[in-house]
Amino acid sequence: MTENIHKHRILILDFGSQYTQLVARRVRELGVYCELWAWDVTEAQIRDFNPSGIILSGGPESTTEENSPRAPQYVFEAGVPIFGVCYGMQTMAMQLGGHVEASNEREFGYAQVEVVNDSALVRGIEDALTADGKPLLDVWMSHGDKVTAIPSDFVTVASTESCPFAIMANEEKRFYGVQFHPEVTHTRQGMRMLERFVRDICQCEALWTPAKIIDDAVARIREQVGDDKVILGLSGGVDSSVTAMLLHRAIGKNLTCVFVDNGLLRLNEAEQVLDMFGDHFGLNIVHVPAEDRFLSALAGENDPEAKRKIIGRVFVEVFDEEALKLEDVKWLAQGTIYPDVIESAASATGKAHVIKSHHNVGGLPKEMKMGLVEPLKELFKDEVREIGLELGLPYDMLYRHPFPGPGLGVRVLGEVKKEYCDLLRRADAIFIEELRKADLYDKVSQAFTVFLPVRSVGVMGDGRKYDWVVSLRAVETIDFMTAHWAHLPYDFLGRVSNRIINEVNGISRVVYDISGKPPATIEWE
């Protein structure tokens, strides 16, 4: 019998902050399971979840507005510790008898708070000391409203000149509120505060570790599918690869992976996937060469959204045909991860249980009555990668830059042709190879090459020629919501350009994209 790794759990109520998923990831990093629910949960749902503690997230609303979100009153009656972050502190203060006002001074960015009273939350935690020996904490503020009076049974723990109640606490009830964001790295001791709350105040054990997550997933897969057969669409991406490895460990040859080679993959990618999963790890793989079918369907199409839909539709058709050839398959496995679940949850349901169709499978034929197996649906992307390493997948594969679902279909601008894909594959491979050689690959968040459907004049030997243009793209980003173009060294860019033009016959010009996001997107289509 495997250990119950969900025994100690934290509930995070989401009030809409851009950092809320980061709070959940930080709690997981502390080795404790947590779930992220919309703020409007019911008492019954909270009772059923039985949390060891509750975190109230930040949010963009103003608690001074009449219809702004409120924590369910039961939260404060559940008898468990509560940690309010920014908006979460404000709604806690207001709901428990304090007062919140819109502030004339919006506090955004770095601040230093002075600890004025002892509290279990920050005891022994400091970045510096005042002249008279009081602890100082470097924190990241982001708020317009501020608490102007705390509930009568709370004490002020820390303050700034413009924020008199930067931390408040009721030690007896184990209720804490902070007017800053402990989950971001700019709050230097933020992780220690979260650890203090989760591990010490809530008394949660560190049960959520890669090895234990794998044991738990394997046990749950075996319990769910028994001796039945399972089918999985294997793309070679992180999510489907880790799903394949977990299922293989759990059910062995009862798993069949269908690898659809659509002709839109990176250089030698199909061979690498088949070698690694088939030959090295011994998975049962059905290889479907379908390049001609995809390219025929894409012929003449220039619109990016239409191309995406065509690629998705043809994938589903090919996958369905292969699935129907297999006998007695009862289950479809998908690489759904926790952010997919969160994104798809309707806030009215409170709990994130509505799961969207994963981009790489789609609808199955009506005659195929199959159950769904989603072994990664509780995991964030960084956790999936850690699980992959534990299962023996190579680091370079797990930490590769993101690759779009439609593949080169959206990196060849306009109509997609085999000639264009072949040129792009080779140019992109040179760019990535040089990034790795220069130790720059892991210093940028994403790098790739784009094929431009324009011919440009070039000089080769004594003659002129008109050949194609490619653009190099490299960005630096934390969350992929905004991004800066990467300032790669000129000599490096020159080396890449020379290699592509000399080694890839058919390309005469290389340009570098220096657009940020916004206004541009990271991908060109």
From Swiss-Prot:
Which pathway does the database say it acts in?
A: Purine metabolism; GMP biosynthesis; GMP from XMP (L-Gln route): step 1/1
* Catalytic site: C86, H181, E183
EC class of this enzyme? ligase
Which residue numbers delimit the Glutamine amidotransferase type-1 domain?
9-207
Q: Name one GO molecular function term.
A: GMP synthase activity
Query: Record's InterPro entries?
Result: Class_I_gatase-like, GATASE, GMP_synth_C, GMP_synth_GATase, GMP_synthase, GMPS_ATP_PPase_dom, NAD/GMP_synthase, Rossmann-like_a/b/a_fold
Pfam families per the UniProt record, alphabetical: GATase, GMP_synt_C, NAD_synthase
Give all residue intervals belonging to the GMPS ATP-PPase domain.
208-400
Which positions does UniProt annotate for ATP binding? S235, G236, G237, V238, D239, S240, S241
Q: Which PROSITE patterns match?
A: GATASE_TYPE_1, GMPS_ATP_PPASE
Q: Which reaction does it catalyse?
A: XMP + L-glutamine + ATP + H2O = GMP + L-glutamate + AMP + diphosphate + 2 H(+)
Q: Which GO terms describe its cellular component?
A: cytosol
Quote the EC number: 6.3.5.2
Ligase found in the keyword field: yes
The UniProt keywords, alphabetically, are: ATP-binding, Glutamine amidotransferase, GMP biosynthesis, Ligase, Nucleotide-binding, Purine biosynthesis
Instruction: Tell me, in a sentence or two, what this protein's role is.
Output: Catalyzes the synthesis of GMP from XMP.
Q: Self-association or partners: how does it assemble?
A: Homodimer.
NCBIfam families found in the cross-reference section: guaA_Cterm (TIGR00884), guaA_Nterm (TIGR00888), PRK00074.1 (NF000848)
What is the recorded name of this protein?
GMP synthase [glutamine-hydrolyzing]
Natural source organism: Shigella flexneri serotype 5b (strain 8401)
Gene designation: guaA
